[in-house]
């Protein structure tokens, strides 16, 4: 649906929201269900409606609680039976500068202004702490947009008496809090309002007539921003950017114009535009976005273009390069298969609207933004929010390296007729241990990013993981896999709750990067051995179907679990007699 891509079609989003909701639900009949509490300092009805639409686009169906008008602080501090019973998964605090109860004047001393700043900050900090203590869920807080006038003109931003200066300092306090609290996220309306246009954003008509903090047409942009944070928290980010070459990464057609005739680099304005776009793509790679090429070109010409002396990207920046004359939708499907990623993990960037239309029609789930003018490429991708970062792990920083190592493994496999011999040749070592504090962030990230090899899709915060690790009744294991090509890092997580002589497995997931290497066998052998050492006689596993995890539907059957229950939705329960288990002894060394 093009209305959700930048630039947003606000008229369609606002006027046809019911129709859009029906279409989104029909397209995704098994969404992830989440409860979102909106605590507002202004009217929030349209905010909830638009946020619900954007989340549905990401496969998340939201149920909303909304505070009464301007009762955000009272609901947070004193509670309401409705909010308490709601048990939110996420809390969004929708406030702006109009909710400040004091602002400096030219008559105030600097000491009085500092005290005022501390008082305004404390108003919010005590609220955040109360919400954390009561609900222990992610909190998304707007920072502050700029006020509707600058009393002192340009001096307003640096003079302590200026409202602009005061709000900037207050925002900095919010950011310092966010840096220290893992469940706390800033929705940057200071940026959004500047990008939208501050005068239109803060149109006072909507405040005085309807008590909307921002103009009606800006609400979809606000909702998109909040939705990007939430979908990132629940593993719905895109993971890969697939790029065309000619007139996408450089100006011109390399097969016709030759490498010397391409527009790329500092010599001409057009070349500067494409160099800047390549720099942006390389920056995306640095935060864990994997890059690939899908271009109608001879491979030799494509590689020559990527080695242009004034280019920023090089062939080794990409995990896959499909430069041929095959249909681009088939190339993209091949890339997805090679990387073990679903099509909905990809963004496809191509200057040609015909190619975009074919890919969008033939590869459901892929995001296909409308690139219009090379000078707008960065803005279009950046405003799309496809790669919103809410956490950044060491594995993210070396994601391209990990995929290159996988390519080396695939090449090595071709030399073996026997798959077992190939696995032996990898010289793998699995390190399986409890939830080590060093890996808490990565474990939590895996629970929120892994969708395909994930039996229960239980999503956990870092605090959730710490709580499991500290409970003697919980069996918690994570696995790291190293081979001769490199270190894959933490790639699998298992957790279960022991009750008497039974162990109930609540979490089992694995990164698809290590599929078919025996890591799941190593984990199962270890789980059963650990369970037996604890006196467990029966292990119970669960499979909860989603749109993405069909590959593990019969996972437990492979290990001689017996299916003991199945409901109408396909949720299954499996049971193993520990004494009857036969270890798998995978092709790797296992260290504890």
Each predicted region: which residue ranges?
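Basic, amphipathic juxtamembrane/active-site segments
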Residues: 254-279, 364-371
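Short hydrophobic/aromatic-enriched beta-strand-loop microsegments
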Residues: 61-64, 317-320, 365-373
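Conserved Lys-Pro-Asp/Glu-containing loop-to-beta segment of HAD-superfamily phosphomonoesterases
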Residues: 332-353, 359
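Acyl-donor binding region in acyl/amide transferases
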Residues: 484, 490-565
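Substrate-recognition element of Asp-dependent hydrolases with the DxDx(T/V) motif
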Residues: 272, 276-307, 321, 359, ...
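Extracellular glycan-modifying ectodomains
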Residues: 1-242, 249-250, 255-261, 354, ...
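A conserved beta-strand-loop-helix scaffold within acyl/acetyltransferase catalytic domains
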Residues: 431-511
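Terminal substrate-recognition subdomain of acyl/acetyltransferases
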Residues: 360, 364-426, 529-592
């Amino acid at each position: 649906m093009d209305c959700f891509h930048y630039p947003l079609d606000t008229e369609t989003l606002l006027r046809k929201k019911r129709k859009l909701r029906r279409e989104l639900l029909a397209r995704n009949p098994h969404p992830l269900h989440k409860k979102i509490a909106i605590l507002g300092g202004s009217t929030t009805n349209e905010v909830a409606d638009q946020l619900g639409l954007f989340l549905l686009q990401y496969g998340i169906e939201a149920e909303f609680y909304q505070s009464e008008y301007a009762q955000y602080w009272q609901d947070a501090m004193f509670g309401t039976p409705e909010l308490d019973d709601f048990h939110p998964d996420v809390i969004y605090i929708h406030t702006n500068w109009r909710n400040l109860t004091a602002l400096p004047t030219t008559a105030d001393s600097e000491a009085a202004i500092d005290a005022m700043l501390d008082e305004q900050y404390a108003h919010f900090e005590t609220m955040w702490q109360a919400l954390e203590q009561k609900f222990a869920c992610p909190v998304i807080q707007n920072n502050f947009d700029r006020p509707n006038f600058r009393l002192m003109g340009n001096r307003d931003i640096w003079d302590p008496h200026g409202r602009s200066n005061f709000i900037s300092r207050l925002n900095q306090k919010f950011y310092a809090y966010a840096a220290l609290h893992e469940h706390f996220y800033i929705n940057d309306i200071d940026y959004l309002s500047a990008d939208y246009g501050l005068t239109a954003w803060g149109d006072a008509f909507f405040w005085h007539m309807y008590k909307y903090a921002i103009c009606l047409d800006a609400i979809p942009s606000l909702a998109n921003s909040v939705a990007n944070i939430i979908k990132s928290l629940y593993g719905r980010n895109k993971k890969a950017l697939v790029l065309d070459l000619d007139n996408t990464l450089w100006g011109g057609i390399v097969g016709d114009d030759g490498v010397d005739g391409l527009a790329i680099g500092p010599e001409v304005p057009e070349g500067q535009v494409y160099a800047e776009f390549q720099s942006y793509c390389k920056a995306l790679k640095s935060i864990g976005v994997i890059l690939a090429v899908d271009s109608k070109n001879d491979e030799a010409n494509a590689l020559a273009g990527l080695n242009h002396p004034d280019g920023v990207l090089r062939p080794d920046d990409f995990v896959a390069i499909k430069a041929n004359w095959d249909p681009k939708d088939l190339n993209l499907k091949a890339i997805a298969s090679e990387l073990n990623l679903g099509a909905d993990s990809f963004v496809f960037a191509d200057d040609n609207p015909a190619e975009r239309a074919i890919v969008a029609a033939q590869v459901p789930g892929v995001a296909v933004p409308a690139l219009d003018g090379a000078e707008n490429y960065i803005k279009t991708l950046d405003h799309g929010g496809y790669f919103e970062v809410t956490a950044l792990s060491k594995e993210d920083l070396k994601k391209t390296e990990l995929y290159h190592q996988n390519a080396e493994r695939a090449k090595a496999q071709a030399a073996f007729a026997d798959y077992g011999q190939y696995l032996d040749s990898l010289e793998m070592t699995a390190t399986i241990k409890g939830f080590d504090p060093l890996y808490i962030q990565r474990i939590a990230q895996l629970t929120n990013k892994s969708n395909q090899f994930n039996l229960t899709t239980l999503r956990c915060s870092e605090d959730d993981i710490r709580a499991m690790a500290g409970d003697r009744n919980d069996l918690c294991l994570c696995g790291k896999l190293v081979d001769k090509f490199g270190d894959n890092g933490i790639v699998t997580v298992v957790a279960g709750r022991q009750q008497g002589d039974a162990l109930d497995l609540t979490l089992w997931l694995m990164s698809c990067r290590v599929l078919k290497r025996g890591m799941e066998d190593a984990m199962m052998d270890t789980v059963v051995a650990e369970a037996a050492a604890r006196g467990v006689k029966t292990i119970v596993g669960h499979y909860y179907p989603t749109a993405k995890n069909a590959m593990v539907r019969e996972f437990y059957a492979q290990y001689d679990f017996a299916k003991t229950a199945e409901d109408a939705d396909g949720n299954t329960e499996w049971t193993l007699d520990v004494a009857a288990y036969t270890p798998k002894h995978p092709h790797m060394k296992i260290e504890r």
